[in-house]
Amino acid sequence: MERRLYVLAASAFIVAAVLGSAWITGQFTTPEVDRTDGYVSELAARDQPWTRLFRTSDALAGLACAAGVALVPRVAREWQAWLALAAFGLFTFAAGLFPLDCATLSDPYCGRRAVSSAHHLHQLAGALGTAALLAAMVLLSARWRSWVSWLFTWLGLAATLLTAAALADRHGAGLAHRAQLTLFAVWLVYVAVHLLITDDPPVPPATAEALDHEGGFAGPHVVEQGAGPVVLITAELGGAWFHWGAVAGLLAGTCHVIRFDRCGLGLSPHATAPPTLYTEVARLAALAPSHPEQVTVVAHGAACWHAEAFARLHPLRVAKLVLVDPAPATERTPSAPARSAGRWLPALGGTWGATAVARLAGPAAHRLLVGVPDPYGVYRTGKVLAAAAGEWLARRDMAADLLRLREEMPFPGVPVTVISAGGPDLGHAGLAGALSATLVRLPECGHQIQLEDPGAVAEAVLGAPGVGRAG
């Protein structure tokens, strides 16, 4: 998928170059704008006959450039360059939205009357966009170390200085500006070609076979505390290991507590494929101790599906299940569009666009949904945003797999505690009855029970197996 992203990004830059060169047709459709002294932006002035065409082409060129940047996979130490190129795209879009009132250089009467604020905004956006593009050219040339890129950069700088001098002299600005825009368009095509021939970035392994109990690059991030019977904690969809710090602290005195981040979440490397129920079962099996030692699995939300499936598929390895506010596994038809989107998300999580969205909205969304800050900044990363979205899109498939598994594999006779938060009935009583489980209701708690009442979770784990369990 990373290669396809490069192709899409390159295509966007080529589209931006073509749309940004629409002024070439204006030499024939708008003869009122002087080719030698007239500024190219005058073709889109409000009083020109083809203003809508050239304004639209400028705006779409800017959006295509910004979209191209958003689709580029992240590369270390290049963020300033791509940020500058995205700024150029946005400034170009703004210039298309706010056109000149009249042909400033070609129309001698234009300067004699007052102009609107949109006229000044267009001039400001044009100047800032040019500065941003030149900065991107310099920064990318320094990173790529290509003489071709440096050639375009120096020619672009020279054309910009020549255009500024011609504007000050009010003679020859049209020729200089057209040369400048031509160089900029050719450089965008060069960027597209560079992306098409570049090597794919290395993708860290993220399969269950690559799990590393010490965390690190080779596998998911794992935190282990204490000694004693093993307790394996799996967070809800999109959750992180630090959400369970209070519960782990209460259990670490008597238990060996294992917390981890699924692929793409927390400090784990990004996922390479959409999540599935059986992948998560394999992950739990890889983290749990080998038979004959057994593990107590604590799961939250939809991750309770993973824990239940693990118990059905590996009954001899489970000592107890604690299901914290489990999500209902309802029978709904899996969505083909969701599957298609899910296949793209692991790659999209590594793009500059996902990074920008996560930086802007991630911490605020996390605080709104969970109610606590993000001390490690993990929700400011694109991979976490993509992984959380991927898990949400995979819910229907996971639920369907669990429902089939319930029909095929009996539930073992292990103690189960279902902790239910206050709020709407999510079928916890029915689940507890089906699993012969103890049902603990906490009407004063919200969904984040591990944060609001960690003692209740610890008590459910430390309680003697089978106590209060319905026969």
Please give the residue ranges for each predicted region:
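Active-site loop/oxyanion-hole signature of alpha/beta-hydrolase fold enzymes
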Residues: 259-298, 302, 314
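Flexible "cap/lid" loop of the alpha/beta hydrolase fold
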Residues: 312, 321-354
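Residue in the alpha/beta-hydrolase core beta-strand immediately N-terminal to the catalytic nucleophile
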Residues: 296, 319-322
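Short glycine-enriched nucleophile-adjacent loop
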Residues: 304-315, 321
